[in-house]
């Protein structure tokens, strides 16, 4: 499992509306391309998701949080 200096996006408690995050869009999952944006809505109801909490960004894009920008 890869580790980084950024906060874990797998735990819902770590992800808040208004935060800057890097997400991976559904269509970019295979290549791992990240998209940066501001969280507008949390879409995952569970407290933990192994692939990242699903969010909608302010620009409407939806993906799973890979890292939280400090």
Language-model-detected regions and their locations in the chain:
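Basic/aromatic-rich interaction segments and small domains that mediate binding to polyanionic partners
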Residues: 2-70
